[in-house]
């Protein structure tokens, strides 16, 4: 999903650049100004959607680790760790420690869910429980914890689906507006006329290729000069 959103974001930015280029020559065009505003809004929406998921877990991890004292952990230790699905702290057991990367593989007690988390995010069980009690959170039963996690995941999924729906609607609206803008620009060209290059081949055998002067100083088209007398054959000995 992130890859698709990144592609859409690049597409929106490219469209915005084209609209801004068009506005440089027609800055009062209301349609272009509205299109620019809409594109800016959908770009911000896409950026927000891309950054929402990782920021939630990161914020929870940072706040949890900020009060984390140093502790020497070993395999088999009980600890309090953050579950990435809801950002809440639960009791877990250390299964493996990676000293090089500063991480630990843990399993949440009573659930069996395994995760790899930074060692700095772990707390001794008693300290973790006390921190939760001090914050006004009473220990919950296993059934209550499962119900809370399920409800959180459900709300998060609904919110995510709604944001995706809004983004898709914005994308469709922009597609229609962009097509209308292109059609209007195309229709302004006179029908039946084809722009020709000043260097295009003449349509008749008597036509000549020249460089137009655009009417400057009433000068005519530059005329073809016969340069045959300068042919190298005239310089060869007879």
Swiss-Prot record:
Chain ranges for the short sequence motif Nuclear localization signal as given in the UniProt record: 142-160
GO molecular function per UniProt: RNA binding
Modified residues (N6-acetyllysine): 219
Subcellular location: Nucleus speckle; Nucleus, Cajal body
Matching Pfam families: SMN_Tudor
CDD domains: Tudor_SPF30 (cd20399)
Any one GO biological process: mRNA processing
Residue stretches making up the Tudor domain: 72-132
Keywords carried by this UniProt record: Acetylation, Apoptosis, mRNA processing, mRNA splicing, Nucleus, Phosphoprotein, Spliceosome
An annotated GO cellular component: cytoplasm
Modified residues (Phosphoserine): 201
Domain of life: Eukaryota
Record note on domains: The Tudor domain mediates association with dimethylarginines, which are common in snRNP proteins.
Functional summary from the UniProt entry: Involved in spliceosome assembly.
Binding partners and assembly: Associates with spliceosomes. Associates with U4/U5/U6 tri-snRNP and with U2 snRNP.
Assigned protein family: Belongs to the SMN family.
The protein's name: Survival of motor neuron-related-splicing factor 30
Annotated source species: Pongo abelii
Species classification: Eukaryota, Metazoa, Chordata, Craniata, Vertebrata
Recorded name of the encoding gene: SMNDC1
């Amino acid at each position: 999903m992130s890859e698709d959103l990144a592609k859409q974001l690049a597409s929106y930015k490219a469209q915005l650049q084209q609209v801004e280029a068009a506005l440089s020559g027609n800055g009062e065009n209301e349609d272009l100004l509205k299109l620019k505003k809409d594109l800016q809004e959908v770009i911000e929406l896409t950026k927000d959607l891309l950054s929402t998921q990782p920021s939630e877990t990161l914020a929870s991890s940072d706040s949890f680790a900020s009060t984390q004292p140093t502790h020497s952990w070993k395999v088999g230790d009980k600890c309090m760790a953050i579950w990435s699905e809801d950002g809440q702290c639960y009791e877990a057991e250390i299964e493996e420690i990676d000293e090089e990367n500063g991480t630990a593989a843990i399993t949440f007690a009573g659930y069996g869910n395994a995760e790899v988390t930074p060692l700095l995010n772990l707390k001794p069980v008693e300290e973790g429980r006390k921190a939760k009690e001090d914050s006004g959170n009473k220990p919950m039963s296993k059934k209550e914890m499962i119900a809370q996690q399920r409800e959180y995941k459900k709300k998060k999924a609904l919110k995510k689906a709604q944001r995706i729906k809004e983004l898709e609607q914005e994308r469709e609206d922009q597609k229609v507006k962009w097509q209308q803008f292109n059609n209007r620009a195309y229709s302004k060209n006179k029908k039946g006329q084809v722009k020709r290059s000043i260097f295009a081949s003449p349509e008749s055998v008597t036509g000549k290729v020249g460089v137009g002067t655009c009417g400057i100083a009433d000068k005519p088209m530059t005329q073809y000069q016969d340069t045959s007398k300068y042919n190298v054959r005239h310089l060869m000995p007879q």
